[in-house]
A protein has these predicted regions:
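Amphipathic alpha-helical segments that line or abut small-molecule/effector binding pockets
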Residues: 62-70, 144, 148
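Residue-level signal for the nucleotide or nucleotide-sugar donor/cofactor binding architecture
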Residues: 56-59, 88, 127, 138-141
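Mid/C-terminal beta-alpha module of Rossmann-like enzyme folds, strongest
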Residues: 67, 74-118, 123, 130
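Glycine-rich Rossmann NAD(P)(H)-binding loop
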Residues: 50-55, 80-87, 135
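A general structural signal for well-ordered alpha-helical segments in protein cores
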Residues: 8, 34-36, 61, 65, ...
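Active-site helix of classical SDR
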Residues: 3
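NAD(P)-dependent short-chain dehydrogenase/reductase
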Residues: 9-56, 63
Length: 161
């Protein structure tokens, strides 16, 4: 958090005519991500534990790219939050992934304390896209709608690779 913020401040000092775009919980077609990991692990294990006390905004990489392009066509520089619309927990996100993928898997909620990771994560990292809405005049897709399209495309391609 702090090092990212310091980097943003430095960039804005050096180049005031810049866009700082913040996103969260990003997933896309290239490389690994939470969606592919949950899908694969759910299919292999049949049971998963996922934290339900961390909240955020799942964000489709194509949606992010589209909105960054729209921003770049303006000269309204500044800091923008650019995330999928709506807030959920990692548990909610995982349940929706498993449901859409049609994977026979039980997803159980757990707390952050029960699922330690090397990096400490904030309990609430959801962002509000108000500045983006005011600037480009539209909203990022609702996270469930974007996820449904993504999962459908992955299914047609043979599932997560």
């Amino acid at each position: 958090g702090k090092s990212k913020w310091l980097g943003e401040q430095y960039v804005r000092e050096v180049c005031p005519r810049t866009f700082v775009v913040r996103t969260a919980w990003l997933y896309g077609y290239v490389g690994g991500n939470f969606v592919k990991t949950i899908w694969k692990n759910g299919a292999q294990k049949g049971e998963l534990k996922v934290v339900d006390d961390q909240m955020g905004n799942p964000t489709n990489a194509n949606d992010l790219a589209y909105h960054i392009l729209k921003l770049a066509l303006t000269d309204i520089y500044g800091v923008y939050h650019c995330t999928g619309t709506g807030v959920c927990s990692w548990y909610d996100f995982a349940c929706e992934i498993i449901r859409l993928a049609g994977v026979p898997c039980r997803v159980a909620p757990c707390t952050t304390d029960e699922y330690p990771t090397p990096a400490k994560r904030p309990a609430y990292s959801a962002l509000d896209n108000a500045m983006l809405r005011c600037t480009v005049g539209d909203e990022m897709r609702e996270w469930k709608a974007a996820l449904a399209v993504y999962v459908e495309k992955l299914k047609k391609a043979g599932g997560p690779q």
